[in-house]
A protein has these predicted regions:
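Predominantly soluble domains enriched in secretory-pathway, periplasmic, or organellar proteins
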Residues: 17-18, 23-35, 39-416
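N-terminal secretory signal peptides
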Residues: 1-21
């Protein structure tokens, strides 16, 4: 951002803030056990990159970094509130239909897991903590929503439990049958989960009616990403040997059906699934020995084969991948570059790149999130502590906002 005027952060004097307003917005946080350091309302440094941005309704974003959650008013580039007391792990999940953010991880003063849910209004810029729940059994690391985002399953790594959150009524039910760092999926009234990430791996199937495990299937070594084809009733597990396919049909539950062998074995990959259940993509995780290539690999779960979406340039190597909630679009960080790749994941087509900010080379380079209409997106720039607002149709960065610290996870809820 060379040559960009630096804007000092302006902090509202707390004595000028209505005490009644402070209690109305902050009371739920104190009651729930989260620490609210102060009423912030800070003006953030912002770089305008294109005219006409003032008419766009961006809504609110939740960012995590440095042990702190920040709620950001994107329209006015203001930091609405900052929350401490929970250590988020791996992600923030937006529930667009309910205007809610779900954060999982563990409390700063506890080794047990925790789930916190924020109710927000993306137009009025109001918020409320409506759930702050402890999950016994160790930190909650991995998570997976169902295709409708009405439920999310979390895995507590200490005892291997599976915890299912109803995103509407906020009830949580616990099940046995997970493991250490489980990767999970929903299928009808079953939970599907791996038992670990390294070494020999099994896929467990848990009946939610009885709470009992009904199948346990060996799925090779380093069984990692898991997804389900709901139409065919099959689970797909990416492992070092390739993709293991396991039956979820009633009569053949747990039967190992076949192995889809990839070109590049021993690469440990994460899955991004589509709600339609017909196909899904994967990206290469940042592990020693893994290589990056100038294409995105997609598994057609109907035909049982792999398809490549080439970027057309050997320098454009997708790494961290994010799919839109409707499964129609994909964004990928490009290793070593400030560009973001855009993919049409329905037509399996590379749509080009849009320039953002710098990213640090790490296990998770940056996070990405789509606005509700899918015509815009936000990405974290971990190299300069900023977030970029991108116009995906024009393939342009139109705003960059500087944050007080390095953002790791980021999600947005925009007006309907």
């Amino acid at each position: 951002m060379t040559g960009v005027p630096q804007i000092e952060i302006e902090t509202v004097n707390e004595e000028d803030v209505s005490r009644r307003s402070f209690l109305q917005t902050g009371g739920a946080c104190f009651a729930g056990g989260l620490l609210l350091p102060r009423f912030l309302n800070e003006q953030l440094a912002v770089k305008e990159l294109q005219a006409g941005d003032s008419d766009r309704m961006w809504g609110v974003a939740m960012a995590y970094g440095g042990g702190r959650l920040d709620l950001i008013d994107l329209d006015n580039a203001k930091l609405l509130h900052s929350f401490e007391g929970i250590r988020a792990t791996h992600a923030i999940t937006p529930i667009e239909a309910l205007n809610r953010f779900v954060i999982h991880g563990h409390r700063a003063d506890s080794k047990d897991g925790a789930v916190v849910v924020f109710q927000v209004d993306p137009v009025k810029k109001t918020w409320e903590v409506i759930l702050n729940k402890e999950l016994p059994g160790g930190p909650a690391l991995h998570w997976q929503p169902n295709p409708e985002f009405t439920e999310i399953v979390f895995n507590t790594v200490g005892d291997g439990s599976l915890h299912v959150l109803d995103t509407k009524d906020l009830t949580i039910k616990r099940y046995d049958g997970g493991g250490q760092h489980s990767n999970m999926a929903f299928f009808k009234n079953y939970l599907v989960a791996t038992d670990k990430m390294s070494g020999p791996t099994h896929l467990n199937v848990v009946d939610r009616n009885t709470g009992k495990m009904v199948a346990k299937t060996a799925v090779g070594h380093w069984g990692h990403g898991v997804t389900v084809n709901h139409e065919r009733g099959e689970a797909f597990v990416w492992a070092s040997e390739g993709v293991h396919v396991v039956s979820l049909a009633q009569k053949t539950m747990g039967k190992h059906l076949r192995l889809l062998v990839t070109e590049n074995l021993d690469e440990r990959c994460w899955f991004c699934w589509t709600p339609q259940g017909g196909r899904y993509s994967h990206d290469v995780s940042w592990n020693p020995g893994d290589e990056y290539r100038p294409y995105l690999l997609v598994t057609d779960m109907q035909k049982g084969r792999f398809e490549k979406i080439p970027t057309g340039d050997p320098k454009l190597q997708p790494s961290y991948l994010q799919l839109s909630p409707d499964g129609k679009w994909g964004l990928a960080s490009l290793r070593g570059l400030e560009d973001i790749a855009i993919f049409d994941t329905v037509a399996n087509k590379f749509e080009g790149v849009v320039k953002a900010g710098p990213a640090r080379a790490s296990f998770f380079e940056r996070d990405m999130t789509f606005c509700r209409k899918r015509d815009c997106a936000l990405v974290t720039n971990t190299g300069d502590n900023t977030i970029s607002l991108l116009d995906l149709k024009q393939k342009q960065e139109i705003r960059r906002i500087s944050l007080p610290r390095r953002p790791l996870w980021l999600k947005v809820i925009s007006p309907a």
